[in-house]
């Protein structure tokens, strides 16, 4: 586990003409048409989008060997002309890439954007005190509504982020560093060097295609490990396709989360517009945030 740095660096705002590099740190690409749609959006905004050497590699279910994926990420990170790194898709693989990995110090950090399995990459940047963006990968970008796209575009150009609104489950107010990610991926990082210190953070989580009992098992692990007793507030995104199998006696995922999170004595806001299967509004991982359990809002400070 690594303590969060006291101060975080935010990459500089992007300018039209800046270079962005596509990397595939996790699973191998399948959705080539969707990838191109995402690239076209970035190019329509005036950015130069280039592809890492191995973005379309295949090694089993991975986008290349661990070393190939490390090398692509490293090359983009060290490229002085590259101002941002766009992850092509999620899947699985970031945990393997992060073995024996350290972010090299550079004069000016750059934006890294992704979600799902990319949670591991975003959390590793926390250790270096660098703000990153939890948000659409290239293969899902074209599914975003106009307001979410403009919110992404504006923030990368230096505009403040508008708050997100959900539904209040537990009242109260909390402020802290925002740590966001996929619940399943995050759970597998507990107890590793990439697990951040959760003391006084706002934890934002989402998931997809996990049965309610599996969500219960993961959240119970967070409770038993003592991590949930440290967080200041919990922001819940979308838990998409998390229904129990037909004919299987079960609670709903909402009932599970309400039961497992309702006695922590901290604000909990649910149904925020981020995650799989719908709007995936960007979240600045590592930035300061405020969770208002009375108003049902997540704001960025």
Swiss-Prot record:
Keywords: Carboxypeptidase, Hydrolase, Protease, Serine protease
Enzyme active site: 116, 206, 276
Family matches, as SUPFAM superfamilies: Class I glutamine amidotransferase-like, LD-carboxypeptidase A C-terminal domain-like
Gene Ontology process terms (BP): proteolysis
Domain of life of the native organism: Bacteria
Keyword Phosphoprotein part of the UniProt annotation: no
Residue ranges crossing the lipid bilayer per the database entry: none
Family: Belongs to the peptidase S66 family.
Name of protein: Putative carboxypeptidase slr1534
Protein source organism: Synechocystis sp. (strain ATCC 27184 / PCC 6803 / Kazusa)
């Amino acid at each position: 586990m690594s303590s969060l740095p006291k101060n975080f660096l935010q990459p500089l705002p992007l300018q039209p003409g800046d270079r962005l590099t596509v990397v595939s740190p996790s699973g191998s690409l399948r959705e080539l048409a969707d990838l191109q749609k995402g690239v076209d959006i970035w190019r329509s905004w005036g950015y130069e989008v280039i592809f890492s050497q191995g973005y379309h590699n295949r090694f089993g279910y991975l986008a290349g060997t661990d070393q190939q994926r490390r090398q692509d990420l490293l090359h983009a990170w060290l490229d002085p002309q590259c101002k941002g790194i766009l992850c092509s898709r999620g899947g699985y693989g970031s945990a393997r890439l992060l073995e024996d990995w350290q972010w090299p110090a550079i004069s000016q950090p750059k934006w890294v954007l992704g979600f799902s399995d990319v949670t591991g990459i975003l959390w590793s940047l926390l250790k270096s005190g660098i703000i990153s963006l939890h948000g659409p990968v290239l293969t899902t970008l074209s599914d975003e509504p106009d307001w979410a796209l403009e919110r992404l575009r504006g923030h990368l150009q230096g505009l403040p982020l508008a708050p997100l609104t959900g539904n209040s489950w537990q009242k109260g107010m909390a402020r802290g560093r925002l740590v966001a990610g996929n619940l399943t991926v995050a759970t597998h990082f507990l107890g590793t060097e990439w697990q951040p210190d959760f003391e006084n953070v706002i934890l934002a989580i989402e998931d997809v295609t996990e049965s309610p009992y599996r969500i219960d098992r993961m959240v119970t692990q967070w409770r038993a490990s003592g991590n949930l007793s440290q967080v200041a507030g919990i922001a819940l995104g979308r838990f998409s396709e998390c229904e129990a199998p037909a004919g299987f006696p079960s609670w709903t995922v909402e009932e599970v989360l309400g039961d497992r999170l309702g006695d922590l004595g901290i604000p909990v806001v649910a149904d925020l517009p981020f995650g799989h299967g719908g709007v995936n509004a960007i979240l600045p991982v590592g930035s300061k945030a405020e969770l208002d359990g009375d108003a049902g809002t997540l704001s960025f400070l």
